[in-house]
Amino acid sequence: MKFGWIKTTGNDSEERIDSVKDALESSIPGILVKREEINSVRELGNIKIVSDSLDADVVLINKGEDLEILKSAKLSGKETAVYVVINTKDDEIYATEVSKLDFVDYVILEGSDWTIIPLENIIADLFGEEIKLVSVVTNVKDAEAAYEILEKGVDGVVLIPKDINEVKDFSKLIERMNSESVKLDYATVTKIEPVGSGDRVCIDTCSMMEMGEGMLIGSYSRGMFLVHSETVENPYVATRPFRVNAGPVHAYILCPENKTKYLSDLKAGDKVLVVNKNGETRESIIGRVKIEKRPLFLVEAEYNGENLRTILQNAETIRLVGEDGKPVSVVDLKVGTKVLIKPDENARHFGMAIKETIIEK
């Protein structure tokens, strides 16, 4: 996962504290601050503090300072970082060497001229090492380049922002860099029938979803259906753009990092994957899970000769995603209707994808 921090800017403490507020409002997880401002930052909110103090969450030293400070910090349970300004080849060598120390968690690299920072060399030298490389940049365009350099890119970026808009753009970039892409395809509906009542799960998130977005849900790991969010206007109830009426308690849901969970295991604070009709994804936090007894519908579909099934609430407001990415209500499904699914050849063990023969029916 790529991450991003902000370095506070401004000529006085008030300006720098404003940078902290900007970071918090934009969900930036960490910030570099002066040691004398640590307490003021903690009063503003919960954010990872990086500073040259043992009171920080990440204890920072500059090149040439005593590495024993970081050893002590590590023993006390802190994360550690070394800040290196790259001006010469010797600086590059130093950065590579400290990156291999087992008590250093982050190496933060700043170049006097971004265009000639030898990040490529350092990334190549440290391939396979546990260290997290962080690049200091002054604009979002350079941040994107740093994340992507040599395909692997740096693990994190420290942005020195000009204003709040740049901080917001940086936050969006981090979200985009961490978004997963899933392959979707069409399956053909072969059966729709009511099956009686059962306990179904509504997932209310902390995000507003858009038309074409939903979550991947299914009875089988080998094929999950894109269940549309409640964003479609209808004459019966108001829209709930934050909600997906997902299905019964037994069903799988696709979560971040290609993991699955049972719907019955979800709770407030968990992260789920919101997926759109193009397979683009973003993470969303669950605000509430509601489990209620409701009438249910079996949906069966065929994909490449295999039968896939899921069960959904029997209600007009529950929709899958049909051809052209348009939502189609379960009450309007017919034999032959095409619906979007995520095919998967892997089995699942405690939510993890594994190569194993498994029969689901």
Curated annotation (Swiss-Prot):
Keyword terms of this UniProt record: Amino-acid biosynthesis, Aromatic amino acid biosynthesis, NAD, Oxidoreductase
Any Pfam family hit: DHQS
Keyword Oxidoreductase among UniProt keywords: yes
EC number(s) reported in the record: 1.4.1.24
Class of enzymatic activity (EC top level): oxidoreductase
Keyword Amino-acid biosynthesis listed: yes
Reaction catalysis annotation: 2-amino-2,3,7-trideoxy-D-lyxo-hept-6-ulosonate + NAD(+) + H2O = 3-dehydroquinate + NH4(+) + NADH + H(+)
GO terms, biological process: amino acid biosynthetic process; aromatic amino acid family biosynthetic process
Signal peptide: none
Listed GO MF terms: 3-dehydroquinate synthase activity; dehydroquinate synthase activity; NAD binding
Similarity-based family: Belongs to the archaeal-type DHQ synthase family.
Function: Catalyzes the oxidative deamination and cyclization of 2-amino-3,7-dideoxy-D-threo-hept-6-ulosonic acid (ADH) to yield 3-dehydroquinate (DHQ), which is fed into the canonical shikimic pathway of aromatic amino acid biosynthesis.
Family annotation (NCBIfam families): PRK02290.1-2, PRK02290.1-5
Protein name: 3-dehydroquinate synthase
Encoding gene per record: aroB'
